[in-house]
Amino acid sequence: MILSIESSCDDSAIAITEIATNRLLFHKKISQELEHSVYGGVVPELAARLHAEALPRILEECNPYFKDLKAVAVTTTPGLSVTLVEGVTMAKAISIALNIPIIGVNHLVGHIYSLFIEKESYFPLTVLLVSGGHTQVMEVKSFTEIKTVAKSMDDSFGESFDKVAKMMNLGYPGGPVIEALAKGGDRKRYNFTVPLFQSPLIAFSYSGLKNSVRLAVEAANEEDFKDIAASFEHIATAHIIQKLKKYFKEVPPKTFAIVGGASANLYLRSSIEELLKPHGADLLLSELKYCSDNAAMIGRVAVEMYKESLFSDLSSLEVCPKSVI
């Protein structure tokens, strides 16, 4: 068994995964959304303090598994440095106390493996990662062979939802709030421009769209917000679809996956499903409960790393807020 810890942002989570079967034996997550919502976003120091309170409480529930643990895994990158440290400090203590190896896991690779929680993995895949911190397309051959072929030049897909929600004083996180509001709105009322539409670049950019929405919000009444939300969600998604169309002309998709917290957006999911139909490509999706940050996905990567004896050095293991894959 492997115990895995996730604390890269505002979710405190611990999981226990069986190595031989990939079975998830335990998983608990304590979200900090309520505490951060009053600030309109994550406050790093508050997040770290809440992790320091929540992680030990969850760990107490894992006592029955301690005697059977073969390794401890923890997210080390990317994320908020002050919150990553909380998880790594706990993982190091467990490693020393139980005399078991420690495995440092890349959070982004974890999101890819959210597709395979309690399942066997299979590759190659073309993966779209959409979250609060990242928007990128990757060609994935294994957990060690990942090539990024397109990424955001500024704001991410998920981050833009958070910022638009903040403009409307709708709280945090913005993704679910904007998605719910958009369902009752007119997607074509506001003619926002699709970012980088004329550009040959296969890349993403949300800063310009965000500014256009800000101007619309400032000129609107509250009853207009649902139409703004719907129009924004439509264009934010159309931007991804347009760039994927360009990429698919160069590299036709065979098996395509969407991962990350913002992959829970049902409009994005259905739009990509329609895009893939002419290609006859398979679409892989994480279960909705595993789209956001969780320790089960970290444990699933760690199982693969354990089998390859890819352990971290306890004395030199450090956090890295920024990571590129």
UniProtKB/Swiss-Prot annotation:
Cited Gene3D superfamilies = 3.30.420.40
- Pfam families from the UniProt entry: TsaD
Q: Which GO terms describe its biological process?
A: tRNA threonylcarbamoyladenosine modification
Required cofactor(s) = Fe(2+)
Q: What is its EC number?
A: 2.3.1.234
Which reactions appear under catalytic activity for this entry?
Answer: L-threonylcarbamoyladenylate + adenosine(37) in tRNA = N(6)-L-threonylcarbamoyladenosine(37) in tRNA + AMP + H(+)
Q: What GO CC annotations are associated with the protein?
A: cytoplasm
Per its UniProt record, what NCBIfam families does this chain match? Answer: gcp_kae1, T6A_TsaD_YgjD
What HAMAP family does UniProt report for this protein, alphabetically?
Answer: TsaD
Q: What is this protein called?
A: tRNA N6-adenosine threonylcarbamoyltransferase
Supply the source organism for this entry.
Sulfurimonas denitrificans (strain ATCC 33889 / DSM 1251) (Thiomicrospira denitrificans (strain ATCC 33889 / DSM 1251))
Q: Tell me the name of the encoding gene.
A: tsaD
